[in-house]
Amino acid sequence: QNHPDKFAFIELDLQNKAELNSVLRQHKNIDCVLHFAALKSVPESEEKFDLYWNNNVKGTESLLEAIEINGIKNIIFSSSAAIYGEQDIQPINEEAEPKPISNYALTKLQSETDIEDYALSGIINAISLRYFNPVASHEDYVIYEDYTKSNNLMSVILQVAKKKIDVLKIY
């Protein structure tokens, strides 16, 4: 069943603590925060470490402080399978030790650690989702990314939903 009145999409700079707390105070009875805010380009993260650390890690820290202040008890965090890096044993499962090999992955792992600290202290309940991209982007069924085009499955899905492109091809 559709409940558009039960959800609020809020776009703001998580490092702006005053605005963040103001928004959370305005939306009473928040059951759960879905935290998808992050920069996510691996190549760019190597060139702009401070930008990625401040946005992804410091932003998450600000959000955690704000949800504690505002009494929100649940968070679902959009992490990344990139935190696993290169593993000797395949397939990778969630018990694999993280071995981040990019600054982007490092920021996701640090954010997970910060969230876990809050959860272990009893402040929040938390789930971190470590996404893999299981969908081939090439018609020969190869897991391949063409970096000259959007490589974000969600952005393509949204383009289809907004009728900006006709079809989503999954191979």
Could you say what each language-model-derived stretch is?
Residues 86, 99-137, 154-165:
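Active-site Tyr-X1-5-Lys
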Residues 38, 48, 53-60, 76-79, ...:
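Short alpha-helix in the Rossmann-fold core of NAD(P)-dependent oxidoreductases
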Residues 42-59, 92-100:
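Short alpha-helical oligomerization interface
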Residues 35, 61-103, 117-127:
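Conserved Rossmann-fold NAD(P)-dependent oxidoreductase catalytic core, especially the SDR/UDP-sugar
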Residues 8-32:
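Conserved Rossmann-fold cofactor-binding substructure of NAD(P)-dependent oxidoreductases
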Residues 6-8, 126, 168:
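Short, conserved active-site loop motifs that form the nucleotide-linked donor/cofactor pocket
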Residues 18, 57-65, 113:
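Conserved active-site region of classical short-chain dehydrogenase/reductase
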Residues 9, 52-53, 67:
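A hydrophobic alpha-helix adjacent to the NAD(P)-binding/active-site core of NAD(P)-dependent oxidoreductases
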